[in-house]
Amino acid sequence: MGGLVVLLVGLLTALMSVVSYYVSPKGNNTSTWQMSLILTFSCCYLLWAITYLAQLHPLEAPSRVLE
């Protein structure tokens, strides 16, 4: 289930990037807007995916301290 969620959110991010490419404001700064939006979506996805996967498969297993 964990890997599927990451892929589905990745597809959603790709879809949002494509939509933002065509919906970005037209004018002198069109390419700046397009790249800014696409990079924002990509960086947010990477931050989320790394955090999600780190919690899904932690490097150290939790241990119980006996008193």
Swiss-Prot record:
GO terms for molecular function: ATP hydrolysis activity; proton-transporting ATPase activity, rotational mechanism. This is V-type proton ATPase subunit e. It comes from Schizosaccharomyces pombe (strain 972 / ATCC 24843). Subunit of the V0 complex of vacuolar(H+)-ATPase (V-ATPase), a multisubunit enzyme composed of a peripheral complex (V1) that hydrolyzes ATP and a membrane integral complex (V0) that translocates protons. V-ATPase is responsible for acidifying and maintaining the pH of intracellular compartments. It is a multi-pass membrane protein. One of its GO terms (biological process) is vacuolar acidification. It is found in: Vacuole membrane. It comes from the Eukaryota. Residues 24-35 are cytoplasmic. The chain crosses the membrane at residues 3-23, 36-56. Disulfide bonds: none annotated.
